[in-house]
Amino acid sequence: MSMLQMTKREFLRRLGLGGVALAGGAAFGDEATREPLPPGDYIADPRYGTCRYIRDIPKMPTDVPSAFLKGGKVLQPARELPVFHEADVVVVGGGPAGFAAALASARTGAKTALVERYGSLGGLFTNGLVLIVIGTAEGVRGGAQRLVTRGICGEFMERAKAMGAGVYRTDRHHGPHQPTIDPEGAKVLMDRMVRAEQNLDVFFHAWGVDVVQDGAEIRGVVFESKQGRQAILAKRVVDCTGDGDVAFQAGADFRQITHNLGFVTQLGSIGRATPEQMSAKAADGFPKVPNEPIPGAFWRNWLGPQGNGLAVRELTAAEFGHREASWRLVEKMRATPGFESTYVMNTCSQLGVRATRLIKTDYTLDMGETNAQTVFDDAIGLSGDDTFTRGAFQIPYRTLLPSGVENLLVAGRAIGVAPNVIDRVRLIPVCMVTGEAAGTAAALSATAGVTPRALDVRALRRRLADNGACLA
């Protein structure tokens, strides 16, 4: 058949997707407006046996140069930005914290938008191939463990287990509440959970770069995409960027620290080695005990050097170095009996930046308080312990409120903690805990017409408890 015009239904039928895709209503179309594609031609390409949809796209106001040279300096004049979207709450960053914040906000009744720079949710959990969900529980008398990161985090883990996306073990190093989860399964599950919320709009491939500010109050965010720079207006903003990017742009004070820049490599054909061969080579960086969500695959987590996780040159050097080290490991393994077929399946698309900015908030949680398990009247959740040797500790709501800035909350690894506490709050489940609290608070405060700082924390705690969160 030569090139021909086809209806959308015919196009889907030829792909074998007709009934499913049309019934779902979201396989094709503009996710921002939820409108169908405009009339146009689906062109069959006989060279590849596929179809392409071709239509003209009108230019946008942002499709113009915005910087110029003058007197040897690069200048960027003020210009009007298109308003892409409006919401009650906008969450910037779709990692574990942003995922939970957006869900919590939408479920609390607020019209919510989630802006994420990559094409999937999960952040370092999925795009960074971190996999293992640690810090979910605390050790209790008798050697048992108590799950403390419930709420949205608990829901996510239960659903991941039900869909067969996780490996659960009961040994002392992992326990029944610290699964290793397939990153692709996690992406799909997160997609399903956010797409089920009518109050939630997700915008991928959009990088939050600035804030819309009115004095000390935040009125929205500015994001960059292939369509140019645009704005989303909102009553409340939740910074889940991990680096406190939004709070930084809003002028919040912060402390910047260095940490290891990690890198994860996924290797294949490991399953051909015998358990004895794996055990014998464990000291050389080879896999020890099979604990992977995909049979025959092995995830190598490189700790990486200390570095500035915001510095472009350092990040670039780390990317080069990690990939080279990964390939050298493969070469070493291929020269070892049982590992001859080893190959690189995947490398993380997101470098393992563990900590950068710690935002100055209304309260800073220190190590002494975490060790003493200090009780706070405004506790919004708990952090577990990945070793099960220490008890869980409370996280106060005030650690989510950037000092001197209104209408903004922060969640994830940039909350107000001392540097020596960061390794206990940057964990995947704890980020979900602070994200859920921040999203709930943002929605409640927007509905009540008060700032997050003026929100009745007792009402917030009641709502979190009603939703399954563990507060003590």
Language-model features: where?
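N-terminal export signals
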Residues: 2-4, 10-32
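C-terminal segment of N-terminal export signals and the immediately downstream linker at the start
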Residues: 5, 26-83
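Conserved N-terminal/central alpha/beta ligand/cofactor-binding core
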Residues: 16, 38-63, 104, 110-111, ...
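Flavin (FAD/FMN)-binding glycine-rich loop and adjacent Rossmann-like elements that form
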Residues: 41-44, 49, 69, 75-80, ...
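Beta1/beta-strand and adjacent pyrophosphate-binding region of the FAD-binding site
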Residues: 84-95
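Loop/turn elements at helix/coil->beta-strand transitions in domains of secreted/extracellular proteins
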Residues: 87-88, 108-111, 198-200, 234-235, ...
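N-terminal Rossmann-fold NAD(P) dinucleotide-binding loop
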Residues: 98
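Conserved beta-strand-loop-beta-strand element in the redox core of flavoprotein oxidoreductases
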Residues: 212-231
